[in-house]
């Protein structure tokens, strides 16, 4: 999509991240968190969806140099996409990762994607994670080649389950290739969906909680 110049090991595909944002019902006023943000793809794609930023809006295409395609058509369509951006959207995205290099990458990628003012990324351990009120958590916990150690992946899923159940948000959507994720997480998902991250077969585990409301 033109914004991810650098990425961490085994990043999630941008198109898959956008699909997860759709499944997570991200809206213009959503608050999205990711405790394992890596290079920031899930949070960035959620921000672009909330703001109605067209994919590839900030990149250039080889077809723009084709003689038989009038230049004004490209300019017209690009301006149309810009006019449809929801500048008044109240979206906020927050990502966390234990790796400072990944956090620096995520912040740089958000700026390249045009959502640097709507997203922020911080260095933090998953044990410190707290879901904010009415937040939607979209995450891709480390597994397989991202981690290399199945026992460590299980430990991270267990920790995520503990902090989630202590501070549940509006919804949690976790994509992983770990077939025993629910067992490690400590709770059966409300829904599951089979999905692929590139050639890696995964499951998207979906957990729902009722949004907190102010008392009248």
Explain the meaning of each model-derived region.
Residues 126, 141, 178:
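Residues immediately flanking
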Residues 134-140:
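Short SAM/SAH-binding signature in class I
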Residues 90, 96-105, 145-216:
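Conserved Class I SAM-dependent methyltransferase catalytic core
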Residues 1-5:
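Non-catalytic substrate-recognition/targeting regions of SAM-dependent transferases
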Residues 12-130, 145-146, 150-152:
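Conserved S-adenosyl-L-methionine
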Residues 7, 11:
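Aromatic/histidine-rich interaction motifs
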């Amino acid at each position: 999509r033109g914004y991810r110049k650098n990425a961490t090991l085994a990043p999630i595909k941008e198109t898959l991240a956008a699909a997860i944002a759709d499944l997570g019902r991200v809206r213009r006023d959503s608050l999205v968190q990711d405790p394992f943000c890596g290079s920031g793809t899930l949070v960035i794609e959620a921000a672009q969806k909330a703001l109605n930023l067209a994919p590839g809006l900030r990149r250039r295409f080889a077809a723009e140099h084709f003689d038989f395609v009038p230049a004004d058509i490209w300019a017209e369509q690009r301006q149309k996409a810009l006019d449809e951006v929801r500048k008044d959207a109240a979206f906020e995205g927050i990502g966390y990762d234990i790796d400072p290099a990944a956090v620096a990458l995520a912040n740089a990628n958000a700026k390249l994607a045009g959502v640097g003012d709507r997203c922020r990324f911080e260095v933090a351990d998953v044990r410190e994670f707290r879901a904010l009120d009415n937040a939607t958590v979209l995450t891709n916990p480390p597994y397989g080649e991202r981690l290399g150690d199945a026992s460590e992946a299980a430990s991270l899923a267990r920790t995520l389950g503990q902090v989630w159940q202590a501070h549940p948000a509006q919804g949690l959507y976790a994509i992983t290739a770990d077939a025993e994720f629910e067992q490690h997480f400590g709770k059966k998902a409300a829904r599951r969906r089979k999905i692929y991250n590139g050639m890696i077969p995964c499951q998207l585990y979906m957990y729902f909680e009722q949004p907190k409301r102010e008392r009248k």
